[in-house]
Amino acid sequence: MLILASSSISRANLLKTAKIDFRQVSFDYDENLDKNISPFLYVQKIVLEKERQFLSTLGKDFQNQNLLFADSIVCIDEKILTKAKDKKEAYEMLALQNGKYASILSAFLLVKPEKRVFSLSKTTLYFKNFDENALRDYVENDLYKGKAGCIMCEGFHQNFITHQVGNLSTALGLDIQTLKAYL
């Protein structure tokens, strides 16, 4: 059995859909790291920090188990977009995407008793212009909350994606194909 060390509903749904036996363990992480580095390095550091925090707090309860740590960020060019703190920040992030593109970087660390596997994947989504009413509803109803870069591929954004380069599961927060290869 896999232990998903994350409160992410999207990641849990991806594992269920892939028929991977898992148990979800929610944990509050401090994800505040310096964003003045490459987005690729940033998302990897976040995953390693999640592992450190989880193991320092709950490690003794999960010895010799298969643990999965993951994180996703959105970047536009080299600008890192994490989770919006409020509606103002959500509108700013969405304005950067409107009629343009955004890349989702998803990293995971699979810790097994016999090995560690680290994966970094990228999916780029290209958007047509957002409908102003749909955008307002999305933000004002707080649907952006908890979403890296305010991107909701399975909701608001799906109506505006013109094409994508990369796997949808990566955009949803976890590269399932790569994970399955190492389970």
Swiss-Prot record:
Signal sequence range: none
Active site: 71
GO terms, biological process: nucleotide metabolic process
Gene3D superfamilies reported for this sequence: 3.90.950.10
Keywords assigned: Cytoplasm, Hydrolase, Nucleotide metabolism
Entry's localization field: Cytoplasm
Function: Nucleoside triphosphate pyrophosphatase. May have a dual role in cell division arrest and in preventing the incorporation of modified nucleotides into cellular nucleic acids.
Protein name: Nucleoside triphosphate pyrophosphatase
